[in-house]
């Protein structure tokens, strides 16, 4: 494949990636957006593998077949509830790939041969230009390894927290911000040392060790309530790691794709931080500004219990119902009976809508994906800002598997770890039914005063079983 054809294929692939992002921004066009991405990636892979500078094509194809087989097997096996962990571990692969590309490219920059017939001044200029190009390559290698290493360990920690293998609480080391700053300063000094003596790989090895520890500490010091932001932030890091690898490999498409992923992930992180009343810088810095007194996780009064039959009677007599799902709905796989209840109530003329918090679940858009999977109509699925003013005029709210995102302590308790975080104001409705397995605290480790309010009733048990019981009673 000629160089010109490869560049044309890269331009087409880049356009398809942009169309993919645009398509994924809306429910109606999400499937088309997914296909745009698949076609774009296929074109990019073919152009790269069979390009004029490609070597070892046979081994690359063998590696792709093995990797693809593992990927398909894992994707078919993984549950929708485990999607956040899968995304996190995939981000770690991008970071590790950037580290390996950086080390593989170390010392591979070859200076061009000096043309004959140059005078002394031209020769000096040529030598200076080659020195600059060598330094640029070494900077690309150094930064590519640094970003990749941070992404790798950060993503591994995120995977551990999301899968429950690592405690979700924030790691609060003494002087943690000074440690982060020291890691950055020492890494910068090591880059200067490396540029002054590129023959020595010791500064790169030392920086890699620091970057691995830095990435681990960044994510470990972020609490469970902020994990959805962490996933989108690591998505951004993986994009910049890919872009850095693109600079090292002199691959324009990898640079463009990495920049698209990096910028979109950063924008999504910023939007989610605003939705959680968190500073974007605080999340990047790893829990900066999160030093609040932990509010009591003790029970704060008597709670009332109810039954599926009583909830069914409430729903029969209601004219408006809002359902606020959370991660518990995903774990119980309750989205299908919830969709059935929605359809049955709408047949009776009840106005049923869904209120989705921006950080509900463990992944941006987690609840939207589950509801779309269960064929819930898009027009009844509303964001927090669109529905929060309607709770006061609502007869019944069903809180299915949500906890921290409906916690009034965020507005009422200034000492709460989630103080200031915008939440779904479900307690303003006439009746609130909370589906929970037990009275345990949520992912942020904070007790929820909602459970003890006069208009709240608790429906204990597996969310899917309880929703199916209500469906039978209807």
UniProtKB/Swiss-Prot annotation:
Heterodimer of an alpha and a beta chain. The transhydrogenation between NADH and NADP is coupled to respiration and ATP hydrolysis and functions as a proton pump across the membrane. The lineage of its organism: Bacteria, Pseudomonadati, Pseudomonadota, Gammaproteobacteria, Pasteurellales. This is NAD(P) transhydrogenase subunit beta. The keyword Electron transport does not apply. One of its GO terms (molecular function) is NADP binding. InterPro entries: DHS-like_NAD/FAD-binding_dom, NADH_DH_b, PNTB-like. It is an enzyme of class 7 (translocase). Keywords: Cell inner membrane, Cell membrane, Membrane, NAD, NADP, Translocase, Transmembrane, Transmembrane helix. One of its GO terms (cellular component) is plasma membrane. It catalyses: NAD(+) + NADPH + H(+)(in) = NADH + NADP(+) + H(+)(out). Belongs to the PNT beta subunit family. It is a multi-pass membrane protein. Its EC number is 7.1.1.1. It is found in: Cell inner membrane. It comes from Haemophilus influenzae (strain ATCC 51907 / DSM 11121 / KW20 / Rd). The chain crosses the membrane at residues 4-24, 46-66, 83-103, 132-152, 181-200, 202-222, 229-249, 253-273, 321-341. The gene is pntB.
């Amino acid at each position: 494949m000629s160089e010109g054809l490869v560049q044309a294929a890269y331009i087409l692939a880049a356009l398809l990636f942009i169309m993919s992002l645009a398509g994924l921004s809306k429910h109606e066009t999400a499937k088309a957006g997914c296909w745009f991405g698949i076609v774009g990636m296929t074109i990019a892979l073919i152009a790269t593998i069979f390009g004029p500078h490609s070597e070892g094509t046979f081994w690359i194809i063998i590696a792709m077949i093995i990797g693809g087989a593992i990927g398909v097997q894992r994707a078919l096996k993984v549950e929708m509830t485990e999607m956040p962990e899968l995304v996190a571990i995939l981000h770690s692969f991008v970071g590790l790939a950037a580290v390996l590309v950086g080390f593989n490219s170390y010392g591979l920059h070859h200076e061009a041969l000096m043309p004959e017939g140059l005078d002394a001044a031209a020769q000096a200029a040529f030598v200076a230009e080659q020195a600059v190009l060598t330094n640029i390559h070494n900077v690309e290698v150094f930064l590519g390894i640094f970003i990749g290493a941070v992404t790798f360990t950060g993503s591994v920690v995120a995977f551990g927290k999301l899968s429950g293998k690592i405690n979700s609480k924030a790691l609060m080391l003494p002087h943690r911000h000074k440690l982060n700053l020291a890691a950055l300063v020492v890494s910068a000094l090591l880059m200067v040392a490396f540029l002054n003596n590129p023959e020595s790989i010791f500064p790169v090895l030392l920086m890699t060790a620091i970057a691995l520890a830095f990435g681990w500490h960044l994510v470990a010091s972020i609490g469970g309530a902020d994990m959805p932001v962490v996933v989108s932030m690591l998505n951004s890091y993986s994009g910049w790691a890919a872009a850095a690898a693109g600079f090292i490999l002199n691959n324009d498409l990898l640079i463009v794709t990495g920049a698209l992923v990096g910028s979109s992930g950063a924008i999504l992180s910023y939007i989610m931080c605003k939705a959680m009343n968190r500073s974007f810088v605080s999340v990047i810095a790893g829990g900066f500004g999160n030093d609040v007194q932990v509010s009591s996780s003790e029970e704060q009064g008597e709670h009332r219990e109810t039954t599926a039959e009583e909830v069914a009677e409430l729903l029969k007599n209601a004219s408006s119902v809002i359902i606020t799902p959370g991660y518990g709905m995903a774990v119980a796989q309750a989205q299908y009976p919830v969709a059935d209840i929605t359809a049955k109530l709408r047949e009776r003329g009840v106005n049923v809508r869904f209120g989705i918090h921006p950080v509900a679940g463990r992944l941006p858009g987690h609840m939207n994906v589950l509801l779309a999977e269960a064929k819930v109509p898009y027009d009844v699925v509303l964001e927090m800002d669109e529905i929060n003013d309607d709770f006061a005029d609502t007869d019944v709210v069903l809180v299915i598997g949500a906890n921290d995102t409906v916690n009034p302590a965020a507005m009422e308790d200034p000492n709460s770890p989630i103080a200031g975080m915008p939440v779904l104001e479900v307690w303003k409705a006439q009746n609130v039914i909370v589906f929970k397995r037990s009275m345990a605290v949520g992912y942020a480790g904070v007790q929820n005063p909602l459970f003890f309010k006069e208009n709240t009733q608790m429906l204990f048990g597996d969310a899917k079983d309880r929703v199916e019981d209500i469906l039978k009673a209807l």
